Amino acid sequence: EEMAASMNMSGGAAWSKLQSYLTSTVKVDYQGKQITLSEVRNLAYSPETSVRKSAYETEIAAYEKVEDAIAFSLNYIKNQVTMLSEKRGYASPLAMTLEQSRMKRETLDAMMAAIDEYLPVFRKYLRKKGGMLGHVNGLPWYDLFAPLGKADKTYSIEEAKQYLIDTFTKLTPEMADLMREAFENEWIDFYPRKGKEGGAFCAGAMWLKQSRILTNYDGYFGSVDTLAHELGHAFHNRQIENHAPLNQDYPMPVAETASTFNEVHLGKAARAEASGEELLNLLENDIKEQTQCIVDIYSRYLFETAVFEQSQNKFLMADDLKQIMLDAQKKTYGDGLDPECMHPYMWVCKGHYYSEGLSFYNFPYAFGNLFALGLYSQFEKE
């Protein structure tokens, strides 16, 4: 284990850093100027169809510049994980991840079976949305995040802060106090910039009894929702910061519970104050988020499973990985998406695939989401 940890610094960890570096620095040419990958991906939420479509095409073109190098990263990280799981006596990388997650295989299989059973419901929603936007062959990928209803309201950082504090004071003052502390003590890196990673995450600094949060804030409700999610992680950190160091670790399925609970509460509070086009937007946004947490997460799980299996027999070139991703999307999204406009490069931009220490960084989101929905339902009853 000591040797594996030492060699990892120039092995899996180095390949992971390469993926992060390339996706955060790749030059994205959009309408005559260069922007970051995070900025062009944020345009998927634009209310303008032409903007969403051109941003999607620009994003796809940008990946072509880095696809081969990142394919090397993915292959060698997965090869290292497979080798170490065998040396440690696990039947597979998934078996090792399940032990890390403190989850039984039967639990995972039951959840995936339930997800598979409900895929037709999500596909019906996607086809309906596609029809509302004028499409006849399913929803094209560039309209997957298209807002419906009125979606032009934006929040400054100060407005987002006050909105979150007011909303969560009604849930628990302890959560609201932590949110105020995070904003006022500058725990949050808000805006996208050159060289910054996409997406969002929260890291605990337990020795300081603080957390640090990264987002790519654009001012829309979705970004406020992301802040609520990440601050949920910070709240989880606050609950365990006084525990002994060996008791501060927790499995990924549980890690997504407080964060998703926050999203559920914020969404319900926002919908209670809305009506008409604004309510339509919030309702559709909630279904859209559930689609990501269930359908897209399932596609990521299928993709990673196939990559682990196939990478043991051959090196997977970028074209191989693109085909595996398309196959996974077709199995999950089905006829809900336009088969001529999917996203073969979703393996390039998602850093979750490139963790050498935690594989299958996908199904915990589905579990945390479903668990949090159940907890919130119980909370309302009580």
Model-derived segments and their meaning:
Residues E1, K27, R102, G131, ...:
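C-terminal, non-catalytic "cap/extension" segments appended to globular domains
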Residues E1-E106, A110, A114-E117, Y163-M175, ...:
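His/Asp/Glu-rich acidic catalytic environments and adjacent acidic regulatory segments
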Residues G89, D218-I240, S259, V264, ...:
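Active-site recognition of the HExxH zinc-binding catalytic motif
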Residues K128-A176, R180, E184, C202, ...:
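Long, K/E/R/D-enriched contiguous segments that form extended
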Residues D152-I157, M206-A228:
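Short pre-active-site segment immediately N-terminal to the catalytic Zn-binding motif
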Residues K153-Y155, I188-Q210:
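Catalytic zinc-binding patch centered on the HExxH motif and its immediate surroundings
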Residues T215, G222, E230, P245-M252:
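Conserved binding/catalytic microenvironments
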Residues P251-E278, N285-Q292, G368:
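Post-HExxH zinc-binding segment in Zn-dependent metallohydrolases
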